[in-house]
């Protein structure tokens, strides 16, 4: 990428931007705020899809359980925000982490 291409890539877009959110919403509260902020900023952001991400800590039994809990939490937040229309654009992410930078993990 040359200097002009980099400057163009870093220029703020005009109007609404399309966005996809990949979130472990059940893990920590920051993701819940991100979902609410994005959906309440519809003059700036066009949320295309939301994906539940895996996580593993004391709140889950493993990455797959963390992803499923995040998926359910996303749907709960969408209901609270009265944005049930986004539930059909919400997907389960992968049940495992990437093994390396070359091997994809299946998801919805």
Model segments located where?
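N-terminal acidic, glycine/proline-rich low-complexity segments
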Residues: 1-108
């Amino acid at each position: 990428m040359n200097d002009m291409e980099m400057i163009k890539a870093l220029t703020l877009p005009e109007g609404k931007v399309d966005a996809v959110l990949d979130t472990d919403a059940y893990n920590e509260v920051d993701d819940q705020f991100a979902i609410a902020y994005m959906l309440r900023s519809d003059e700036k952001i066009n949320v295309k899809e939301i994906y539940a991400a895996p996580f593993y800590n004391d709140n889950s039994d493993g990455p797959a359980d963390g992803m499923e809990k995040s998926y359910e939490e996303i749907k709960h937040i969408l209901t609270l925000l009265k944005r049930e229309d986004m539930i059909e654009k919400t997907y389960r992410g992968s049940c495992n982490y990437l093994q390396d930078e070359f091997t994809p993990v299946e998801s919805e």
